[in-house]
Each structure stands twice: as C-alpha cells, then as structure tokens.
Amino acid sequence: MSGHRKRVYPQSQFQYANSVPAAGQAAAPGYPPVAGMPQADYSQQAQPQAQPAFLTPAQQQLHQQIDQAVQGVGNMQLHNVPVVDPNGFYQQQPPVTTPGAVPSGAVPQMQQQYAQPAAIGKAMNQLYPIDLLTELPPPISDLSLPPPPLMVPPEKFVVPSETANAPPDFLRCTLNALPKSNSLLKKSKLPLALVIRPYQCLSDSQNPIPLTSDGXXVRCRRCRSYINPFVTFVEGGRRWRCNFCNLANDVPMAFDMSTQGVPTNRYERNEVQHSVVEYLAPREYAVRAPPPSVYSFILDVSQNAIKNGLLATAARTLLETLDTLPNHDDRTRISILAVDNSIHYFSIPTDEEGDHIKMLDVVDLDEPFLPMPDSLFVSLSECRSNLEKLLSQLPEIFQYNIMNKFALGPALKAAHNLIKRIGGKIIVVSSTLPNIGVGKLSKRNEAGVANTSKEASQLLSVQDSFYKNFTIDCNKTQVTIDLFLASDDYMDVASLSNLARYTSGQTHFYPGWSAAKLTDVTKFTKEFSKHLSMDLSMEAVMRARGSSGLRMSRFYGHFFNRSSDLCAFPTFPRDQSYVFEVNLDEQIVRDYAYLQVAVLLSSNTAQRRIRVITICIPTTESLPEVYASADQLAITAYFAQKAIEKVFSSGFEDAREFLNKSVQDILATYKKDIVVSNTAGGAPLRLCANLRMFPLLMHSLTKHMAFRNGIVPSDHRAAALNNLESMPLPYLIKNIYATVYSLHDMPDEAGLQNENGEVVLPEPINATSSLLERYGLYLIDNASELFLWIGGDAVNELTMDVFGTPEILQIPIGKNELPVLENSEFNARVRNIISKIREHSDIITYQSLYIVMGASLSEPVNHASAREVATLRLWATSTLVEDKVL
C-alpha cells in the first residue's frame, strides 16, 4: 500500500464555501476574572472587546448602523454590549471558574447571602446581529458548536470548579438566560424547555460519574430538591440554604463524616463539587429489594418469519449474546415464547436436572394460561446450557411451519403474566402483522388517503385500543416492551409503536428485511445484540424541578406520565432523550434560576441509585440578552416534539404550518423589538448569530420523512415519527440536516489515524446538490443510513480505487458494503471513515451503506437497474435539504 501512487482526481475550480467566515473565532467578552479560592475578587468589570482591524463593506455598514442606534436610543438599553465582529459570535468560552484548592477543614468565605443581588452589570452573553441573506451558504460548522455558555460567576458556587454546572450533554435549556417575567417570554416567541439525557452511554461502566456511596442523600425538607453546588451554608455551616425555595435546612452530621465515622471536609463531597452526581439510595427510596434483570422473548415462528430467516437470525444472535446480557449478580432470568396461531412455552430445566426441554402448546388465545409457571421463567446462570440448546434447535423445530397467523396480543398477555411479579422487559421479534386474537390488526387502505388531510387520523391512529390499554397494566407491574419488526409487508408500526412509547421502550423497524441479504443480517444482529447488552435499570422515575416561578408543564418522550410532574419508566433506556416544557408561573425576582432533574432507579447490580443533574441559569429583563443566549439546537428539538404532537392532533399540514409560523414569529419579533433601524438599499433578514442555523433546521424539518408533503408509506412515516420522539439531540440534528463529506478531494490526513489513534474525518460541506460534482465521491450521513454517492461522470481511476472496477455501470449499487481492495490506500481511507461514523457507544444504531450512482449523459436509458437507480437517487437527494426538491 505504501508504494501505491497517489491519484489526483478532478476537483472544482472554485471553492464554493471558502468565503464564509468561520463561526466563533473570538470568545465573547464579559467574563469576570478568575481567581483562586478563597481570596477571589469578583468586582472587576468586563472590558469591551476591541474592534477588528479590517472590516468588509457590509460589516462597516452594519457597525455604523448599530453605533447610530446605540447613540439614539441609549436610554432604552436595547444594546448595552460592545459591538464586535458579527461573524465572531459565541464559541466554546473559557470556563468562568477554575478549580480552586480548598484547605482541609476550611470553609470558603466567598459565598454571598442567598437574597443578595448580583453585582451591577453582571456578565451576560452578547448579541451579535447578522444578516441571514449575506450568510449564504449557511455556515454549517455552527451545528457542531456548543450552546451559548451559562454565564454564572464563581461566587455562585460552593466550590468553584469546571464541573459545577451541568454540561449540555446531560441537560440543556433552550434559553441560557431566562426571562424574569412570563410577558417577556411570550414577547420573545422563543420556547422555554429542557432537553434531558441523563445517561450518555449504553453501559454505566463507561465514563462513570461521581458516586456518593455513604447513603446520605441530603434534600430540602420543603421543596425536596437535592443539595447541589449552588446552595449556601449559613449559621456557621450548621445549616444550608436551599437555592430553589430559600429554606434553611439543617446539615446532617453524616454530611461531615465518612462511613467509618472519621471527620471529612464537606467541600470535597461530590454533591457540592459536581452538578451531575449519583447516590446509592438509602432504604426509604425502595419499596422492595432491587429486582433481577428479566427478559421475556416473544419470537414470531409463523410462515413469514421462517421464510425471511428472521427466526433463525434472532435465535442465533440471542445465543451469541448470552455472554454480554447484563448478569452482574447471576440473578438474570429469561423466558422464551414461540408464537404463531398458538403460544408455545418452553419448560427449561436447570443444567443439573438434565437437558430434556419440553414444548407446551396453548391454543386457547382468549384465556391463555401458564401450564408450568416455575420452569417457564428460568435463571440464565443455572440453565445456561439448556438455553443454548433450545436456541440452537428453535429454527429446526419450526422450519416446516405453514401457519401464517401471529397472535401477538395473547402472547403479550401471557408474557406479562410470567414476569409481572418481578417486572422486566418483553422483547418482541416479528415479521407478521398481528392477525388473530386480542389486538388483531388489518392492513389499512392507503390509496386515496396518503398525502391528504385524513392521513394522520386514518393511517397513523391506533387501530385497536388494546395497544394503549395494555401499557397501563405494564406500567403497574414495571414491564417494558421493545419491538423488532422486520418484514417486507405492512406491519402497522403506528399501532404497535404505542406498546413501546408508553412503557419506555423502543420500536425498531426493518422494512424489506431478508436474511438472504448479508447487509440486512448485519444490521439486525448488531442492533439486536447491542440492545440486549445495554445496561438494564428497572423501576425508574424521573422528575424535574425548578426554582421559584418555574414549573414543568408538558413532557415528551417514551415513558408513562404517572402524575403532573412524575415520569415513570418500567426500565430506563440508555439511548433515548426527553424534552420537558417549562412554564413561568410568576415573576422571577432573583438574578439566577435553578433547574434540577433527578432519576431514581434500580440498577442491574442490585442497587437503588439516584442520579441528580443541576444547572444554574442567569435571569434577565432584557429581550436582546434572551436572544443572545438562545440555544438553536435545543429549540429545534423542542419544536420537533411539538410538531409531532400537532401531527396526531390535527394533521401534517398543520404541523408544517406550525413549524413555518414559529420561524416567522421569531424573525418578526427580532425585527420589531431588537433591530433598531432600517437598512437603506436592501431588505436584510436580521437575526442573532447564535440562531443563524435555526431557520435552516426548521426548514429541513418540514422536509423530513416524518413531516414532508407527498406520499410516504405509513409504516415508514410512523417509524420516522417514533425515532424523532426519542432520538438524542446530536443524532436528531444530523437526522434533520444530514452531514455530507466530499471524499474525492479530502485532505491527505482524512481517513487515517491521528496521534491519538482516532480516524480523521474530512470537513463537512453543505447539504445541497449544487456542491455535488458530476465526477465526485460523497458520503451522506443522516444518523440512520449512509449514502455513498459516486458521480455519474467519475473518472475510471476513481472508480477503480474505490470499487475495484473501471466501469461505473459495474459498481454494485444499493445496500452494499464497500469492497476491500488490498492495493488501494484510498479505498482503505474511505472504509476507515465509514467505520468511524458507525462507531457509537451511546446508541444501538448500525447504519447501512447505500451506494448511489449519480446521473450521467452517457448512462443507458433502459439498463436493467434503471428503476432502482432512480429510486436510490431520489432517496439520497431527499437528504440534501438545502435544495428545493421536496
């Protein structure tokens, strides 16, 4: 490979996006100086940032207009920040605090009294106005920027540290400066909501957070918030004042003692140093001992599942995953139900009792019973050999099955009866529409209804109330349902997905799946295996709290809303995200507000744990400061949830109209209340720099499969809506606005490992077909699939280096893997990039690769794969959301 001569492929003669200034080149001013504890001096005021030495004519005109506006309306305090380069807006700013060493036993003297006002002129994010019409093409590098920083001075922390405010990966607010009044919030037209992801990895052993294991979970006796880095100790440290409700609470003696009774320094405790902490919960937080991990598998053994190979693939994958199934304490239990027009139980003895496995058939679907309850639900450790034997023989047992019925409803009730005393997961693997017994479904007539005002009500509604009512029973008994649906026929994802939605589960949809396709098998086995290996936490509840004036009002995600503010999770997933809408019920009088999320659950290590996440957010009476601190990605996530809600309540047209109107309202408010003068000689479209990608994201959302106009199969539409409901924020943004890499002209280091052993990815380009050269090679990543686009006029050298064939018409299009070419370094680099993109430790998704050939003038009109090529092109180009195609 080292002797391979590097090829130079054709490249564009004009760099389309090079003229766009990089976002975030200068840190925003306004930070107080950082000093060590406890002699910190926070009185120094922020200094104005110097003007840039060179300005473009547009920037000079913009500066003159803003200067005139500031002079003319200075008393109105509309612009109370220094003017800087509008293209130098917020970037990852240096922390406002640095870790300070606290002498052992010493009490920091830098805390203010709870109600003491902040210093006049506190540092806030600054408003950097831009003209959207001059920001073309949109600077997509902004999508990878962090949100505007939380401007919290060190004196607000018990112990200043970089971890004293929760990182945005766990908890981020749509507004990082909260309006003090509801009238100001309404005036802004910006939403106030939280995007929550309490767990960042599929396994708790990856990137663990600080754990407090002494059993002392200190909480406010009035509002029940947990002690956190923003409380104050008063009365000589004997009491602590709650930052949520202002109540002074006694500090328990155990707070200053180790588990061995040795005095310790309270300022070294995790809960006052970190805003993301976990507790080993004391006994009063559990109504029973933590249950074991429980899995009940419902396997479709009907004719469809035999023919397409799903049963054999699922059984083999489960067999290979037994070693990685969570079983830390050897208490994990398993049951297997095979289902067609009957329910087939398997009585599995322990390995010591022998290897005779009995299959017990129950044909009464109206009243399914448990023939031998004690041996149908067995220990993984004690029955390991017999479980392996059963899974190996399962495809053979049903290989000649000709039944085309699938009794999912009765099977769900049977599995629920098996595990309801303990709780756990019911995992359904099916390729057949439930067509017998309770919950029977039928194929809907999509002709004449798709792409009409009746589409949502007739194609996406639940056919049978069983799929909602049954979830109530599951929540009472701590049972989650996960679905793996793989078929080339209609599955009614809209009805079935309710089972997962209201039990904190997930629906995984594999349209057109067949075990005859290696790529289909690879995707299913990798995702099914990762799902089974994910840590299982049971009996979970999550609650969010706000300081005075803040209240959680609406909740979005996969869970069961048990009360006005308590979300219940029979099992807590590691690969989902949630959105909570926040109401401003009363005037906020303080300079800082607080939000806290707590998750209580039973881990699969037989421990009851509490994860607490707290953030401190400055408050303001200034509309420009509210806009300057708006988080465009979190706002997009919120509007996506509201649009999904709108689909089910009033249809797709109203959902698209809602998204468009939301953007129009924000632009109109900014123009009316923040832009202070008109611009001569043009009609600029003004917005602040930290929101400049927001209109594009919302426009892209209207083109998403979940919302776009046109005929979309209802199963695909329902699956897209289901994914948007629960997708973690980074993947949600990528699913809305795909990442496009240009590979034929990528830098020399791209596709190779850097000094840290990480594969270097090329810089993304804008998602528009105007940038796709007819001779180029591009990779499109939308978080669900990967598209490798080869231009129709690509030179033979490029196709030879990538695919091993000089003829472009011989390239294997469709769902395929890139061939391994031993003598092509370029092929290895492209494969490295694909592998890097597929690496995920926080979600189970494995992205299939689709090879797409672009149009060419020399392309035969009626070649054999013309229809498939056209379909693939349309699908791939639908991700290029900057085009006016859809």
Curated annotation (Swiss-Prot):
Lipid bilayer topology: Peripheral membrane protein
SUPFAM superfamilies given in the database record: beta-sandwich domain of Sec23/24, C-terminal, gelsolin-like domain of Sec23/24, Helical domain of Sec23/24, vWA-like, Zn-finger domain of Sec23/24
Domain of life, source organism: Eukaryota
Localization per Swiss-Prot or TrEMBL: Cytoplasm; Cytoplasmic vesicle, COPII-coated vesicle membrane; Endoplasmic reticulum membrane; Golgi apparatus membrane
UniProt keyword annotations, A-Z: Cytoplasm, Cytoplasmic vesicle, Endoplasmic reticulum, ER-Golgi transport, Golgi apparatus, Membrane, Metal-binding, Protein transport, Transport, Zinc
SS bonds (residue pairs): none
Example of a GO biological process term: intracellular protein transport
Chain's role: Component of the coat protein complex II (COPII) which promotes the formation of transport vesicles from the endoplasmic reticulum (ER). The coat has two main functions, the physical deformation of the endoplasmic reticulum membrane into vesicles and the selection of cargo molecules.
Record's subunit section: The COPII coat is composed of at least 5 proteins: the SEC23/24 complex, the SEC13/31 complex, and the protein SAR1. Golgi apparatus membrane; Peripheral membrane protein; Cytoplasmic side.
Protein name (Swiss-Prot/TrEMBL): Protein transport protein SEC24
Taxon lineage: Eukaryota, Fungi, Dikarya, Ascomycota, Saccharomycotina
